[in-house]
Swiss-Prot record:
Gene3D superfamilies: 2.30.30.30, Nucleic acid-binding proteins. Keywords: Cytoplasm, Elongation factor, Protein biosynthesis. This is Elongation factor P. One of its GO terms (molecular function) is translation elongation factor activity. It comes from the Bacteria. Pathway: Protein biosynthesis; polypeptide chain elongation. CDD domains: S1_EF-P_repeat_1 (cd04470), S1_EF-P_repeat_2 (cd05794). NCBIfam families: efp (TIGR00038), PRK00529.1 (NF001810). The keyword Isomerase does not apply. GO terms for cellular component: cytoplasm. It comes from Phytoplasma australiense. It is found in: Cytoplasm.
């Protein structure tokens, strides 16, 4: 059992028949009354984030999850195919389970697939940042150097994000997979 006083960021718990990952928490001990723990929890099945306040000292059941490194191979209609990098077994995941993470998947990308009880697929964990090729961007106008000027760019996965004016079609850029924001040019090309 996990005591709320011993919460750690990244831990997984069972709460209200759901599997949650602790995103952040704060122990509060008011002058009067009992101590409590404010927490922000991500539902690993749905991806939604909730705020919940637990009384201090309450015990919760840990959720035992497995993370397996897999490589994205290809998509076929509504299915996305991943391969275990150790055993070479292939795994199909439905499009609706991947939600907003679809926009970052490209052939060969290494991800972690998170399983509950070794059989239920909860979600996939993407790298924090990935390199994607710009397939279309309006050309930048020479002399248009206003600070913080952005334009839309379409990436190889179909994702459209805001990029600085100096980014052109064909360049590789680094994108934050949590926020979907442009980080920098990819100088490794």
């Amino acid at each position: 059992m996990i005591n709320t006083n011993d919460f750690k960021t990244g831990q997984t718990i069972k709460f209200n028949n759901q599997i949650y990952q602790i995103i952040e928490f704060l122990h509060v001990k008011p002058g009067k009354g009992t101590a409590f723990v404010r927490s922000k929890l991500r539902n690993l099945r749905t991806g939604s984030v909730i705020d919940h306040t637990f009384n201090a000292g309450i015990k919760l059941e840990p959720a035992l999850i497995n993370k397996i490194k897999m490589q994205f191979l290809y998509s076929s209609q509504e299915k996305y195919i991943f391969m275990n990098t150790q055993t070479y077994e292939q795994l199909e995941i439905n499009k609706d389970q991947l939600k907003e993470k679809l926009h970052y998947l490209y052939e060969g990308l290494l991800v972690e697939i998170i399983f509950y009880n070794n059989n239920e697929i909860l979600t996939i964990s993407l790298p924090d940042k990935i390199s994607l090729k710009v397939t279309y961007a309006e050309p930048g106008v020479k002399g248009d150097t206003k600070t913080n000027s952005f334009k839309d760019a379409t990436l190889e996965t179909g994702l459209v994000i805001k990029v600085p004016l100096f980014i052109n079609t064909g360049e590789k850029i680094i994108v934050n997979t949590e926020t979907g924001l442009y980080l920098s040019r990819d100088n490794n090309k």
